[in-house]
C-alpha cells in the first residue's frame, strides 16, 4: 500500500525540491565579484559559470528522465540531491576558476536530474487543467526561492567568504533529500520502455517541439538578465552587496504576481492561448 501525502504539503515539498536551480544560481550571484577577486580573473569568467551551470542543468534533465522512469521519482530525486550536495561541497576546494567550472557543471547536472523527478511526480498525480493549476501553484511557491536566495547569499557574503555559499547549498540539498526520503511516496509504476524510442517520439512531435522552442526562447531571455544582474548592480551601478537582494527581488515580486494572474486565467482560458499572448507581450517588451 502506497503512503498518502497531504495535498498542500506535497506542493510545498515539490516546490522546494524543484528549487535547486534557482537556489544554485541566485544564492551565488552576490558572490560573483568576490570570486573574481579570489581567483584573480575577469568578472566575465565567473559569470560564464552561470552558462556552464545551465548547460549542465539541461543535460542532467536528459539523463534524469530515464533514471526517473527506471528507478522511480523518489530514488531519482535522492540521487540527484546527493550528487548536487557532493559537488556543491567540492566547489569549496576549487583551486582555479576552471576547476570551479567543472564542479559547477556537475552540480547542475545532478540538479537537472532532481528537477525532472519533481515535474514527473506532479504529472503522475495530476493531468490537464488540474496539472496546469498545480504547476502554477508550485511556481508561485518556488518563486520565493529566487526572491530569498540573493538575501541568503548577501547575508553569507557579509559574514563569511564566498565558500560559505556552497556550504549553504550542500546543507540545503541534504536537508531536502532527508524530507524526500522521509515523506515523498513513490508515484510511478515501472513499465519497460525503449529510451531511444521515447526521445524519438518527443523530438518528432511537432506540438512538443514548438512548446520547447517557445520555452527555450522565453527562459533564454530571462537567464541573460539573471546572468548580468550581479555585474550591472554591483559593479556598474556600485550598489553594495547588502542591497543587491532588494533590487534583484523586484523582478521576482513581479514574477510571483504574474504567476497568480496565470492561475486565475487558467480558470477561464486554455493554457496554449495564455502562453501565446504572454510570449508575444514578452517579445514586445524585450
Where are the regions a protein language model picked out?
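Juxtamembrane intracellular "pre-TM" segments in multi-pass secondary transporters
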Residues: 1-4, 185-212
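Extracytoplasmic
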Residues: 9-43, 225-230
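Residue-level signature of mid-helix packing/kink "hotspots" within the transmembrane helices
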Residues: 26, 54-62, 146-147, 252-256, ...
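Conserved MFS/SLC helix-loop-helix module at the cytosolic interface between two early adjacent transmembrane helices
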Residues: 59-98
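Helix-to-loop junctions at the C-terminal end of transmembrane segments
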Residues: 61-72, 258-272
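Helix-loop-helix hairpin linking two adjacent transmembrane segments in secondary transporters
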Residues: 99, 128, 136-181, 246
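Cytoplasmic helix-loop-helix junction between adjacent transmembrane helices
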Residues: 103-142
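Transmembrane alpha-helices of Major Facilitator/SLC transporters
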Residues: 246-267, 282-285
Amino acid at each position: 500500500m502506497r503512503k498518502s501525502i497531504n495535498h498542500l504539503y506535497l506542493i510545498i515539498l515539490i516546490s522546494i525540491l524543484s528549487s535547486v536551480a534557482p537556489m544554485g544560481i541566485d544564492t551565488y550571484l552576490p558572490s560573483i565579484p568576490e570570486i573574481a577577486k579570489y581567483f584573480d580573473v575577469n568578472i566575465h569568467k565567473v559569470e560564464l559559470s552561470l552558462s556552464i551551470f545551465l548547460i549542465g542543468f539541461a543535460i542532467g534533465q536528459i539523463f534524469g528522465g530515464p533514471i526517473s522512469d527506471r528507478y522511480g521519482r523518489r530514488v531519482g530525486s535522492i540521487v540527484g540531491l546527493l550528487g548536487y550536495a557532493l559537488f556543491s561541497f567540492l566547489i569549496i576546494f576549487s583551486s582555479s576558476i576552471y576547476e570551479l567550472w567543472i564542479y559547477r557543471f556537475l552540480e547542475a547536472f545532478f540538479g537537472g536530474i532532481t528537477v525532472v523527478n519533481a515535474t514527473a511526480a506532479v504529472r503522475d498525480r495530476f493531468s490537464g487543467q488540474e496539472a496546469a493549476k498545480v504547476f502554477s501553484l508550485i511556481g508561485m511557491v518556488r518563486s520565493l526561492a529566487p526572491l530569498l536566495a540573493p538575501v541568503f547569499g548577501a547575508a553569507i557574503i557579509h559574514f563569511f567568504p564566498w565558500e560559505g555559499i556552497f556550504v549553504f547549498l550542500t546543507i540545503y540539498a541534504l536537508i531536502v533529500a532527508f524530507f524526500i526520503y522521509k515523506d515523498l511516496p513513490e508515484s510511478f509504476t515501472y513499465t519497460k520502455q525503449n529510451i531511444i524510442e521515447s526521445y524519438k517520439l518527443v523530438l518528432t512531435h511537432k506540438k512538443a517541439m514548438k512548446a520547447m522552442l517557445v520555452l527555450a526562447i522565453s527562459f533564454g531571455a530571462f537567464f541573460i538578465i539573471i546572468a548580468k544582474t550581479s555585474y550591472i548592480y554591483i559593479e556598474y551601478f556600485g550598489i553594495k552587496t547588502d542591497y543587491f537582494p532588494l533590487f534583484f527581488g523586484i523582478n521576482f515580486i513581479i514574477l510571483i504576481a504574474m504567476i497568480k494572474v496565470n492561475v486565475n486565467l487558467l480558470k477561464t482560458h486554455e493554457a496554449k492561448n495564455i502562453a501565446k499572448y504572454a510570449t508575444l507581450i514578452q517579445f514586445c517588451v524585450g
